């Protein structure tokens, strides 16, 4: 079976590695162009490119798949099926129609829930207790195609987007190589999604991470985990950004101004008034400094009153 693979970030490498280990012929790996990264803005290849070159696979890095010349290049590879894992661009019909078996996509949610670009963050923000991964066949819509297989996992109360995303793509890679042979033989009945049950996530922006202290503490605590590693949950003190790396809900009947530090926890961490309950700042990162305990940060703040905003 001739496979064309589309993916970009580190967690997409799990699927590429699994396909190579299973002995499939990868006729091409399509990934995003090298981009400037890091403080020195050095041109950096996507992790999938690094993995593909290590496997000796041909790599394509088009700026967009909408270019007709790119479409013809993909067609010339004569793939039987495509596999997509967080490539970073919705595939248009001209691309979708190239492989006879279409494109299979690994999506880190239990579709039709949490379609779109940020399903893991969406599940954490919503306080879900279970999530999972879906193998589905792409159609021209956004994560709306029929389902081949799903696997469910518990979503622990301390789950963070970065590690959970990696875990789900590992699981998805395993599920993919299990179902791919049966799919190719026509032994899997595709299950249409119930579009009436669909929920959709949005692309995150940096400002999404700014904390509104009038929100309930439980919502802000979820933000610290859902927005890790990016855009992070943050606030400001004396005009400087303060990232909230880890936090805990602290029940209180106090009625201070939201954002005001109203005391210390048993561990010495600051307790911040929110719209409902207080939030214990367990770990924070001041601007241009390393992460530190909330207690250490509070000890270095010399002010009779602290209000974050």
Swiss-Prot record:
Where (6S)-5,6,7,8-tetrahydrofolate binds, per the record, is at: 109-112
Q: Which UniProt keywords apply?
A: Protein biosynthesis, Transferase
List, in alphabetical order, the Gene Ontology terms for molecular function in this entry. Answer: methionyl-tRNA formyltransferase activity
Cellular component, GO annotation: cytosol
Q: What's the short name of a Pfam family annotated to this entry?
A: Formyl_trans_C
Entry EC no(s)? 2.1.2.9
Q: Which reaction does it catalyse?
A: L-methionyl-tRNA(fMet) + (6R)-10-formyltetrahydrofolate = N-formyl-L-methionyl-tRNA(fMet) + (6S)-5,6,7,8-tetrahydrofolate + H(+)
Q: Which residues form a coiled coil?
A: none
Database matches in InterPro entries: Fmt, Formyl_trans_C, Formyl_transf_N, Formyl_transf_N_sf, Formyl_transferase-like_C_sf, Met-tRNA-FMT_C, Met-tRNA-FMT_N
Write down the Gene3D superfamilies for this protein, in alphabetical order. 3.40.50.12230
Q: Does the keyword field hold Glycoprotein?
A: no
Q: Which superkingdom is the protein from?
A: Bacteria
Extract the SUPFAM superfamilies matched here. Answer: FMT C-terminal domain-like (SSF50486), Formyltransferase (SSF53328)
PANTHER family in UniProt: METHIONYL-TRNA FORMYLTRANSFERASE (PTHR11138), METHIONYL-TRNA FORMYLTRANSFERASE, MITOCHONDRIAL (PTHR11138:SF5)
HAMAP family on file? Formyl_trans
The Swiss-Prot or TrEMBL record describes its family as follows: Belongs to the Fmt family.
NCBIfam families per record? fmt
Q: What is the protein's known function?
A: Attaches a formyl group to the free amino group of methionyl-tRNA(fMet). The formyl group appears to play a dual role in the initiator identity of N-formylmethionyl-tRNA by promoting its recognition by IF2 and preventing the misappropriation of this tRNA by the elongation apparatus.
| Full protein name | Methionyl-tRNA formyltransferase
Protein source organism: Chloroflexus aggregans (strain MD-66 / DSM 9485)
């Amino acid at each position: 079976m001739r496979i064309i693979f589309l993916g970009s970030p580190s967690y997409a490498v799990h699927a590429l590695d699994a396909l190579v280990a299973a002995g499939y012929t990868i006729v091409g790996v399509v990934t995003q162009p090298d981009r400037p990264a890091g403080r020195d803005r050095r041109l950096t290849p996507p992790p999938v490119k690094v993995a593909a070159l290590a496997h000796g696979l041909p790599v394509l890095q088009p700026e967009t798949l909408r270019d007709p010349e790119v479409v013809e290049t993909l067609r010339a590879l004569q793939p039987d099926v495509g596999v997509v894992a967080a490539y970073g661009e919705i595939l248009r019909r001209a691309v979708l129609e190239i492989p006879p078996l279409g494109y299979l996509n690994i999506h880190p949610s239990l579709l039709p829930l949490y379609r779109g670009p940020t399903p893991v963050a969406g599940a954490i923000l919503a306080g879900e207790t279970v999530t999972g991964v879906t193998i589905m066949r792409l159609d021209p819509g956004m994560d709306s195609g029929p389902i081949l297989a799903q696997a469910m996992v518990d979503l622990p109360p301390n789950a963070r987007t970065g590690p959970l995303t990696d875990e789900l793509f590992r699981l998805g890679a395993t599920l993919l190589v299990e179902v791919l042979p049966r799919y190719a033989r026509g032994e899997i009945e595709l299950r249409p999604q119930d579009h009436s049950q669909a929920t959709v996530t949005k692309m995150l922006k940096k400002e999404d991470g700014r904390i509104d202290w009038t929100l309930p503490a439980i919502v802000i605590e979820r933000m610290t985990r859902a927005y890790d590693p990016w855009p992070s949950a943050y606030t400001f003190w004396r005009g400087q950004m303060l990232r909230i790396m880890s936090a805990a809900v602290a029940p209180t009947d106090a009625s201070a101004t939201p954002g005001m530090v109203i005391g210390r926890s048993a561990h010495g961490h600051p307790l911040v008034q929110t719209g409902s309950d207080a939030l214990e700042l367990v770990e924070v990162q001041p601007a241009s400094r390393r992460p530190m305990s909330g207690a250490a940060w509070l000890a270095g703040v010399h002010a009779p009153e602290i209000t974050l905003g």
